[in-house]
């Protein structure tokens, strides 16, 4: 009986260490849906969407996609999705000068409304 308890404790410790190691390498998917202040189809709208794609040049950004909403199920017109190899990579992106400048100079001024959500992705 004591042997079984000991083996159970050892397996629990190994599992916890494995889980903790995985949490340090968990991928992150950052998603935002948004509505612009610009008229649909305008040059300003197109310029904003081009500017978003430049965020892909920031170190750590993977799989950046900017998508157009096709249904009337909500008030948002566009979606943005990108992935990061880790929480650390995502944190570095958030504080990167190019991202901060984009948010201050474009996002705050040109986005009417948005919803942001971040997911852990299974490894």
Write out the residue ranges for each language-model feature.
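N-terminal secretory signal peptides that target proteins for export/translocation
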Residues: 1-2
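A periodicity- and composition-biased signal for non-globular, repetitive helical segments
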Residues: 8-9, 35, 105
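Conserved short beta-strand edge segments in small beta-sheet-based binding/regulatory domains
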Residues: 61, 103-118
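C-terminal structural segments of small proteins and small subunits
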Residues: 90-95, 100-107
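Alpha-helix boundary/capping residues
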Residues: 12-13, 52, 97, 106
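Short S/T/G/P-rich N-terminal loop/turn motif that feeds into the first structured element of a domain
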Residues: 13-78, 85-92, 118-123
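Sec-dependent N-terminal signal peptides
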Residues: 5-14
């Amino acid at each position: 009986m004591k042997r079984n308890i000991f083996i159970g404790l050892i397996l629990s410790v190994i599992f916890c260490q494995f889980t903790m190691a995985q949490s340090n390498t968990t991928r992150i998917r950052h998603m935002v849906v948004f509505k612009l202040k610009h008229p649909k189809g305008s040059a300003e709208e197109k310029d904003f969407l081009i500017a978003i794609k430049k965020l892909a040049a920031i170190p750590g950004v993977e799989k950046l996609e900017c998508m157009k909403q096709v249904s009337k199920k909500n008030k948002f017109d566009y979606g943005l999705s990108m992935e990061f190899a880790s929480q650390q990579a995502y944190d570095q992106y958030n504080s990167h000068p190019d991202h901060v400048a984009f948010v201050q100079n474009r996002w705050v001024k040109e986005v009417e409304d948005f919803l942001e959500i971040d997911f852990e992705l299974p490894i």
